[in-house]
């Protein structure tokens, strides 16, 4: 079963685990573990996607409980009326707070996007980022005798494919566990020494700016273990929990 963070008559929010597909495509038609089908079976009604999370990303995923609700949610995402906040563990010490305005060329899949236009120019892509903490661990990686990691808060202002992963790679602070845009040597070291065997990117919060509602997704065991090893426990208090209760018997946390 998936953790339901919030549900009302219009929408449902779940905490998507890393490694789960949001929905099947013709490329993944034999996939057994899919968020949409699991939520449908769990709550007993159809759900409609409003946005996406990459397969390796964990965290808050919103779905409409009708096609109209899904359409309106998607529209709010497009118009930036719903804000998203992520947390990531990155290579090196990213300590400043800034806005990166760096256009991105659309990434096309050779199979899924084989009919898409390939002559598109770079599309606007803007990300606000803020360094929260740093750590230096006594583990040699490559030619360096120690390994440095940073905990970063991210707010995408646009929604390009793999935007956060590509923007952090552009800053030379790739997300740990990113097999496509990251540092393979760092990924192997993180997995071997600290159990970081997945993309360390988590969609922590989705506030609805028109309503006094913010939905927070708790961190999984891999994240909690990393925060403990790096001395970062207490820095993400709204997300650092494994089990908790909420009004109406919902497994979630709603802050307003």
Give the ranges of each region predicted by the language model.
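RNA pseudouridine synthases
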Residues: 1-256
